[in-house]
From Swiss-Prot:
It comes from Chlorocebus aethiops (Green monkey). Keywords: Acetylation, Biological rhythms, DNA-binding, Isomerase, Isopeptide bond, Nucleus, Phosphoprotein, Topoisomerase, Ubl conjugation. The lineage of its organism: Eukaryota, Metazoa, Chordata, Craniata, Vertebrata. Residues 434-767 form the Topo IB-type catalytic domain. Specifically inhibited by camptothecin (CPT), a plant alkaloid with antitumor activity. It catalyses: ATP-independent breakage of single-stranded DNA, followed by passage and rejoining. Pfam families: Topo_C_assoc, Topoisom_I, Topoisom_I_N. This is DNA topoisomerase 1.
Amino acid sequence: MSGDHLHNDSQIEADFRLNDSHKHKDKHKDREHRHKEHKKDKEKDREKSKHSNSEHKDSEKKHKEKEKTKHKDGSSEKHKDKHKDRDKEKRKEEKVRASGDAKIKKEKENGFSSPPQIKDEPEDDGYFVPPKEDIKPLKRPRDEDDADYKPKKIKTEDIKKEKKRKLEEEEDGKLRKPKNKDKDKKVPEPDNKKKKPKKEEEQKWKWWEEERYPEGIKWKFLEHKGPVFAPPYEPLPDSVKFYYDGKVMKLSPKAEEVATFFAKMLDHEYTTKEIFRKNFFKDWRKEMTNEEKNIITNLSKCDFTQMSQYFKAQTEARKQMSKEEKLKIKEENEKLLKEYGFCIMDNHKERIANFKIEPPGLFRGRGNHPKMGMLKRRIMPEDIIINCSKDAKVPSPPPGHKWKEVRHDNKVTWLVSWTENIQGSIKYIMLNPSSRIKGEKDWQKYETARRLKKCVDKIRNQYREDWKSKEMKVRQRAVALYFIDKLALRAGNEKEEGETADTVGCCSLRVEHINLHPELDGQEYVVEFDFLGKDSIRYYNKVPVEKRVFKNLQLFMENKQPEDDLFDRLNTGILNKHLQDLMEGLTAKVFRTYNASITLQQQLKELTAPDENIPAKILSYNRANRAVAILCNHQRAPPKTFEKSMMNLQSKIDAKKEQLADARRDLKSAKADAKVMKDAKTKKVVESKKKAVQRLEEQLMKLEVQATDREENKQIALGTSKLNYLDPRITVAWCKKWGVPIEKIYNKTQREKFAWAIDMADEDYEF
């Protein structure tokens, strides 16, 4: 193209004085030649280029017509001046077009093509060509046609590349800033991606920033779909037999269903317990037909083996499911969750905790519960009480059924309730722990505990004075309060004998639950506690107490039998009334919450070293948490897989130690080479080996910390205190102060539950 231009230029200079018509013919030939070349390129380009071609042709026609009229006018001098100006513009345009062609070529090499922009031809041609030395490369002038230019279409493949890069970076969790900021401004996709997380944040209901409802009002609008009932019983296949006294016996559907509950637990320890077997057989017979009752009279003659094997095979089959089958089940569960797992409360979508009704089965209980083995009957719609607002759509019961009752009580937080048949207790469907109602309750609980901090010294002085009271009732109350404060004991509720497991709290302690030691293990005035607490978890502790407490306990135990109450003049009602007099809202649980939270805060201050790395700080946190769990007696049985997991962890530690030893040998060898060689390459090798050793040392330390943590916590339940007794703002403040990621302490569910604390607390927060 550039050669043709030079040839044309020289031709114009040589024939400058020739006839006007000849000049125009040459000029048009040149123009047509260029136009043909552009036409070839444009066949590959998009519709926009075609549009430019049509504009080009139109401009040529206009030019010809204008030429004719101007020649007819005969104003040749004026005409010549104009052509001088036009020729200048033409030369500039040709230069720009030549550079544009080179640019297009380069862009094609880079993986995308940009259609050449053909400008409209000038209205007239000139005859004067300026000297070559005056011609300078210029930027492409912007004219009206450029306003139609759309860079978004040209950079289509750029956008695709950028999208792909962004996706790859998001997968790695490292979203980098784009190198070319101008491109980002033109391309809308990345901007949309950046805005998505912000939208998610906006959707989170920051209820703690809103004005609270009047006392007692829990909500103003509540709508939900009701509960999901347990699926109906599916009879066993004919190939699965039940035997009684060695003979096959076909059971009625109701009797068979209850028999399957026992068969599923056949290998469990429960089915060997006499009380479990007795309660089960009694309730099973209630579901039998008269004929079955006459035949089945002894549980020991019943053979549930085939039933048990059938359910084991089903469990194994579920484990062996294909990915497609598992995905199908997951999708069905998600569909169910989407429909029934959420409610609308005060124009906000809130998650429901337990929207499924518990299926029928056998009651287990904790410890040696007197009712273990009894039949938990199937809950029907006729047992259900629905709670929603008056202006909400009442959920529809299953076809052929109706609800027991529909209420509109906005002073309670439950959505659905029913009464279970074992102990006659009321069961509820409630909102998820991350909901506003649950969050407000937690916040209020910790604020009450903080109020106790202001008057706890006064209360302690008061009960110390009461140890010397002339009234036995006051002395017993003061000693009980001392135990609740110092040992974080629960108050203990009064229970009907034979109805529940024999668990006790502070007020219900019996003489048999404590032993007094004037001196034990080098300590004076030691009280030895041994009783079953909540959930039949054993509380065993040896505690040195103040002398006056010890003397009072000796007095309380005088002339009493082991089964007699230690605090015979005290009950939970009397104690709670006294606590309310000391501070509004004060209960034994508030004392537990206060002591747990204050212990965590003190332990974190003592155990956290500023120069420790993150894993060491997390170990310090878990040790502080464990101190609280021990105080609150949050125990657990060691996991069944504990020994195996510890062996696996130890083998990892041993392997890491070997790797570290090898790395240290390599470093030593590299240092020796560096002393001899004394060049830059060997120095780099030494630095590389040093970094490898440091990395392995860190990895080994993490594994050792993990092993220590597991061993120390194998019988301690850290989660109970973390979720229920520790003010989360203490943890959040500690994380922010020491740069520990909150994800290392709280999992996703816990972060949702404590969103209010994470948003509210800063590093200077004090309980």
